[in-house]
Curated annotation (Swiss-Prot):
Belongs to the TRAFAC class TrmE-Era-EngA-EngB-Septin-like GTPase superfamily. EngB GTPase family. Pfam families: MMR_HSR1. This is Probable GTP-binding protein EngB. InterPro entries: G_ENGB_dom, GTP-bd, GTP-bd_ribosome_bio_YsxC, P-loop_NTPase, Small_GTP-bd. It comes from Exiguobacterium sibiricum (strain DSM 17290 / CCUG 55495 / CIP 109462 / JCM 13490 / 255-15). NCBIfam families: GTPase_YsxC, small_GTP. Keywords: Cell cycle, Cell division, GTP-binding, Magnesium, Metal-binding, Nucleotide-binding, Septation. Its cofactor is Mg(2+). It comes from the Bacteria.
Amino acid sequence: MKIYKADFITSGVNPEHYPEPLLPEVALAGRSNVGKSSFINKLVQRKALARTSSKPGKTQTLNFFNINDEVMFVDVPGYGYAKVSKTEREAWGKMMEKYFTTREILKGVVLLVDIRHEPSADDVIMYDFLKYYDLSVIVVATKLDKIKRGQRDKQIAAIKRKLQFDGQDTFIPFSSETGEGVDAAWEAIYRHL
């Protein structure tokens, strides 16, 4: 996929902060430090469109990115980070719930999980939440380059089992380091638009 435009548009916590609903949106969700920013940067072939951090909990708002004037990526705060206050976590949860349940141009959600580990309880809750609201889900298993080839099938099966993965959704092993999964991710995203 040729990327000729990838721009940060705005951040928001309430609907009045969201950009005008002119482009279909795809949200990116996952645990803190699962690789959401690296995923975005790899897809758009930029090093720092979405800021990466070794410190979990960096994303605290909904961040909107215009990609090729065709789709808006919406990076949501990571969940499961223990060093954020309970009040702040609850506020993020309400912000994300409002976005996921009211944004009519939301076409799907990319749920990122770490392929090296079974999904956390928070990952399962998020997947169940998205399915409950009948949102299309693309599960992207990040950090593929961190496991041996022989472990891939076992890890994929464990993730699908733990999530009770719906076969109508898409599952993509992905590496921000090697680029494996980039084409499959774009194909899945465009199928949802």
